[in-house]
């Protein structure tokens, strides 16, 4: 089985490379898991918590269609970030509300204040990863008009015609 489909891809708290233990392929997992990661709060149709590799953060945020993001923790590996995310999932969603995101709904929360609030939920052993002055980014996705949100499975069509008004995250509008 491919290491790119390992459990720790979607559930970072299951990472084991920091222990020298393989899930599927230790060489691959060490390269992927044993590098700096960030935990962030994103406004993408509502406030959510997420984890990504430090080097991929901006790409990840654009893929999710986030309008605003704030880094709240910087860790040395994927496992540490996963432990923080699990604790925060008791207080924040870890899913993007794609319909709200595409409709332009924003949480309106002050991300700096929300980051401070989130830090109270960090596990004690991970408190030192909190970044009080974390990077904050605003992203825009220009398109004409308010899109009508309709889900379409592209595989069902040999040809699909229309006007591409914009792109937000992984969604064509």
What is the predicted role of each segment?
Residues 1-173:
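Non-catalytic accessory segments flanking enzymatic or RNA/DNA-binding domains
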């Amino acid at each position: 089985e491919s290491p790119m489909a390992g459990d720790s891809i979607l559930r970072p708290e299951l990472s084991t490379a920091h222990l020298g233990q393989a899930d599927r392929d230790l060489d691959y997992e060490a390269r992927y898991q044993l590098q700096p990661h960030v935990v962030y709060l994103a406004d993408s149709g509502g406030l959510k918590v997420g984890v990504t590799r430090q080097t991929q953060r901006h790409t990840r945020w654009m893929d999710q269609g986030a309008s605003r993001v704030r880094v709240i923790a910087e860790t040395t590996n994927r496992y540490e970030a996963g432990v923080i995310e699990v604790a925060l999932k008791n207080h924040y969603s870890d899913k993007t509300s794609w319909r709200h995101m595409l409709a332009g709904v924003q949480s309106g929360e002050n991300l700096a204040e929300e980051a401070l609030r989130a830090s109270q939920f960090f596990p004690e052993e991970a408190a030192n990863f909190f970044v009080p002055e974390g990077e904050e980014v605003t992203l825009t996705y220009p398109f004409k008009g308010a899109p009508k949100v309709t889900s379409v499975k592209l595989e069902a069509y040999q040809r699909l015609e229309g006007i591409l008004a914009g792109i937000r995250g992984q969604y064509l509008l």
